[in-house]
From Swiss-Prot:
One Gene Ontology molecular-function label: proton-transporting ATP synthase activity, rotational mechanism
Chief location bin: membrane
Underlying gene: atpD
Topology with respect to the bilayer: Peripheral membrane protein
Protein name: ATP synthase subunit beta
Class in the EC hierarchy, top level: translocase
Organism, as annotated: Priestia megaterium (strain ATCC 12872 / QMB1551) (Bacillus megaterium)
Lineage of source species: Bacteria, Bacillati, Bacillota, Bacilli, Bacillales
SMART domains: AAA
Amino acid sequence: MTKGRVTQIMGPVVDVKFDNGHLPAIYNALKISHKPSSASEVAIELTLEVAIHLGDNTVRTVAMSSTDGLVRGLEVEDTGAAISVPVGDVTLGRVFNVLGEKIDLDAPIDAGARRDPIHRQAPKFENLSTQAEILETGIKVVDLLAPYIKGGKIGLFGGAGVGKTVLIQELINNIAQEHGGISVFAGVGERTREGNDLYHEMTDSGVIKKTAMVFGQMNEPPGARQRVALTGLTMAEYFRDEQGQDVLFFIDNIFRFTQAGSEVSALLGRMPSAVGYQPTLATEMGQLQERITSTSVGSVTSIQAIYVPADDYTDPAPATTFAHLDATTNLERKLSEMGIYPAVDPLASTSRALSPEIVGEEHYAIARQVQQTLQRYKELQDIIAILGMDELSDEDKLVVQRARRVQFFLSQNFHVAEQFTGQKGSYVPVKETVKGFKEILEGKYDHLPEDAFRLVGRIEEVIENAKRMGVEV
């Protein structure tokens, strides 16, 4: 007998008591199917996931959808296995929820399709791949100063409204189209509108045919938001392990995964730790991140947007994520206020790949020179604010002049923002990026006005802008 009854309901957390000595294992999926017997009742189809054994044949579970209409005494059935989701080619071009149920308007998924459990072990050490190859994004500031690694983990950090989602959409646009391989997108606790926009953009561009999408958005209960990243990851792992593909895995937003965990943590009876987060924060993050990796068979390159609460990088949620990443792209509010987009902080963003062995001597030297110039400009800003430009030495004046040109040249227009800006987006190959910054630092364009460098792609566009401004080039 694998049936039990609901004994207690605390929002998204439900206690279930089983009789006859049966006890479902941790992570097992339990199902509640209730047909209404009167007009005042509602039909209930609900999946619960076992989180804790309380003793006395009772388990504490987390609901994967709304618990509205649930009452004590309802019958619950143990499925005998963890939540499993469809994997393989049937997922491409489709949109799913946390349980692997289709939420688009297309035909139902074939009942015979392979399904894999969302909980599994990370790959073994001996199977991991260690090669480093650069992934070109076409975004100058990223490719020059904090390049991404194929098969690596990349984090886009930023507070509210500085452009994380736009950046991740541009990366999907640039990389998914250039890369031509398979992509998986997991929308974790973000706006449904953004997911809808993304789906339609991908449909228009044709990328959707090679993409699987899973969503557990802001309006979903915390159980769904906590597990939806694992649903997407399970789909990506199949393409990596069974088909040997190089998969792109996008997550927007990994902070909401942590946030969902903290919402249910107190209800599950755990003592909160720093800033009210769950005490198991590092473990949960590790279990997810260690599975996102590249093996000798195939690779998963993951790009994760990470919300930084109140712009505080020492908050436990972003701080715990930092440790797992190969490259970080930090978005800075001050830059977005100056109208420099993407608002990537060139001094705070880091990458393991920025070394002469991986990017080459010239690229490395130019990147370091750009950072030194911007760092010196940052140091001089206090002097300029108090005494003005006239008090600087000629050498420092030149540094400031070039630094401002470099700062503006790090900005560019995005394809995904064309409908808002009316400007065409630009994709800049790494070689062109390095060439442009090299020429600026050599002083080749000192005579051109600063504004000519704003929101352009290649260095040739700067010259065209200057001509339009009536400057002798």
